[in-house]
Design a protein with these regions (language model features):
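Hydrophobic helix-and-loop "lid/oligomerization" segment in the mid-to-C-terminal part
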Residues: 7-134, 155, 173-176, 182, ...
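A residue-level signal for conserved active-site and pocket-lining positions in enzyme catalytic cores
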Residues: 30, 137, 296, 479, ...
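A short acidic, amphipathic alpha-helical/loop segment
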Residues: 147-151, 359, 374, 478
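Histidine-centered active-site/metal-ligand motif
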Residues: 164-165, 367, 425, 513
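Residue-level marker for buried hydrophobic side chains located in beta-strands
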Residues: 80, 137, 160-161, 238, ...
Length: 587
């Protein structure tokens, strides 16, 4: 079960409420998002694109712009090399489109997940040389590709790196010494010598900053005209790469959603249409859980070039055809994922892995492209750091997903002798290794792991404990000011004790969600909606109140007190909008 915590951060909530014309409840939520200054609150609630940081604050941006413009002027063949996930695809689109506006001779190469693996490799470098490429510009990769960039240099090609991943390092006398690749410019906010105010931007935003800097430098009208469209892809990258929706990320996603709604890009418009997303209902949720997975599916089960082709579609007909194919591909990916999760559960039980602090699960028959998704689902269920390893064409490949208390990239660096290649950040990573090293890796990771039992218990952070009736139409509407929600800015959570569950009604085509009639301690009757695991809820009721309790509840004969964590939303049906209370947790 989880541990519930009610936030108790202090501030003058009445003053904030008066200053920003919000309720004290909303003011308290803002404080729970670690905002302390009025300037921070103003930026959070009403931030505009002008509040984002100058691209020139990124280390090496001046050199990157100079080298790219020089290559364009000299007529060099420029190749953008990205990655096969959404961030890599969108980053590639941003840079390629921007360079095209400059009149550059430019094309794009996206590594094949299985044949090439992540990022730059010798094959891509040698292929670029054969095809007359004079400059390589990386996006969403490159920071850990020193040997490959050395090869490119030796072959007479120029390289500019744009990335956002952790910089590789070695330990010398107890100090970290960064190992930057030998490129003409290395633009990465995670460089220790980079003074950019916010490190948490994705590859797509770094790419956008490069194009913004070139636009400022040149005043190119074509670049000025595509800024709105490029912002769409920076927003999509940010959400799909699970960046925290704080600081300028929040502004970029908020403004990017507005641009996507206007439909600047035929490919995104088509993808929304085939997924039946109304533009006026678009949210960060749709980016991360509907549109993003369709783009990601190409890199998982086919080639990510298909996603890039969708985004580069010129006609609606071409875009619709490509969008339908991507949607079908994503359905196939979902089916494979369900099977993979079942296999992971079986492996955990058979290998008594619940005793391990770090779970290293080898599923040779699972498609390597869905290892990360499976790792995320297993992490959610067991709340342990998880590595899912699969058998690739050349050794073992895998993905890791972590919990907040465990810095995965640092932990991997401590045992890097087991990897032929690895990279990532605090909460996610990718790797390649030899099959014979799997068990030694599992042993080493667990021996070095300092996590305590308390770290494995999920925490539920409640913003405000208050009666459901306090969350009226006005508050529900006001909470929309806090959108977009996502990593780093979760939907606000409220809690109330001793709600009496009186009746329940299952809903949906497969009866997988439910509505409950509850009576509050104040004597009011309210309706709670639940989209969680109904089977688990039923088992909980039967255990707590006796066999038959679940049946009694759905028969309208319930009288079961529960404490509940809930969210407040708005539901519109047949033109009528009303407050909706959504149960998240119970005990």
């Amino acid at each position: 079960m989880e541990k519930w915590y009610v936030a108790a951060k202090k501030a003058d909530f009445d003053k904030w409420a008066k200053e920003f014309h919000i309720s004290p409840v909303t003011a308290r939520i803002l404080r729970n998002r670690d905002l302390t200054e009025e300037s921070q609150i103003r930026k959070f609630l009403y931030g505009k694109l002008e509040d984002c940081y100058s691209p020139w604050l990124l280390k090496d941006m001046d050199r990157a712009v100079e080298e790219i413009l020089k290559a364009v002027k000299e007529g060099l063949h420029i190749r953008v090399i990205g990655d096969y996930d959404v961030d890599g695809i969108c980053s590639s689109y941003i840079l390629t489109k921007g360079f095209q506006m400059l009149g550059a001779q430019v094309d794009t190469a996206i590594p094949h997940r299985i044949h090439d693996g992540y990022g730059l490799n010798e094959h891509l470098i040698e292929e670029a040389k054969r095809e007359g490429v004079g400059m390589i510009v990386t996006c969403d990769n490159g920071i850990a590709a020193a040997p490959q960039i050395e090869l490119a240099n030796s072959l007479g090609m120029r390289v500019v790196v744009t990335d956002h991943h952790e910089v590789p390092y070695i330990e010398e006398n107890g100090e970290r010494k960064e190992q930057l690749p030998p490129a003409l410019a290395v633009v990465d906010p995670k460089r220790s010598d980079c003074s950019y105010p916010f490190q948490g931007i994705c590859g797509g935003v770094v790419a956008l900053k490069v194009i913004q800097a070139i636009t400022e430098k040149t005043g190119n009208p074509g670049l000025i005209n595509i800024q709105d469209e490029l912002l769409e892809f920076a927003a999509l990258s940010t959400v799909c790469d699970v960046m925290e929706l704080k600081d300028e990320n929040r502004i970029l996603v908020k403004e990017g959603l507005k641009r996507i709604q206007k439909g600047y890009n035929e490919g995104l418009k088509a993808l929304m249409e085939v997924n039946e997303i109304a533009p006026d209902r678009l949210s960060a949720y749709h980016l991360g859980f509907v549109l993003g997975p369709c783009l990601n599916a190409t890199g998982r089960l086919d080639t990510a070039k298909r996603a890039l082709e969708l985004l580069q579609s010129f006609t609606r007909a071409d875009a619709m055809t490509a969008a339908r194919e991507l949607k079908d591909l994503n359905e196939s990916r979902k089916n494979l994922t369900v099977q993979g999760i079942q296999r992971a559960d079986t492996y955990i039980q058979e290998h008594h892995m619940t005793e391990d602090k770090v779970m290293v699960i080898y599923l040779p028959e699972v498609h390597e492209s869905i290892a990360g998704i499976i790792a995320g689902k297993v992490r959610e269920k067991y709340h342990h750091p998880v590595f899912i390893l699969t058998k690739g064409e050349d050794g073992v490949k895998g993905s890791g997903r972590s919990i907040e208390a465990y810095h995965m990239y640092d932990a991997m660096t401590q045992v890097k002798q087991f990897f032929t290649k690895y990279g990532g950040h605090k909460l996610a990573a990718g790797l390649s290794m030899r099959e014979e090293d799997i068990e030694p890796l599992r042993t080493a990771l667990n021996e070095k792991c300092t996590l305590m039992e308390d770290d494995f218990i999920p925490r539920v952070h409640i913003d405000v404990a208050m009666p459901m009736g306090y969350a009226d139409d006005a508050l529900a509407g006001e909470l929309a000011l806090l959108e977009p929600f996502g990593t780093g800015n979760p939907k606000p959570l409220f809690a109330q004790k001793d709600l009496i569950f009186q009746a329940g009604f299952k809903m949906g085509a497969n009866k997988t969600c439910a509505k409950f009639r509850v009576k509050t301690p104040e004597g009011n009757t309210q309706t709670l909606v639940f989209f969680g695991d109904l089977e688990r809820l039923g088992a909980f009721l039967n255990e707590k109140y006796g066999i038959g309790s679940e049946e009694a509840l759905y028969a309208g004969r319930g009288s079961f007190p529960l404490s509940v964590v809930y969210q407040v939303g708005q539901n519109t049906y047949k033109g009528r909008t009303e407050v909706q209370y959504i149960m998240q947790n119970y005990c």
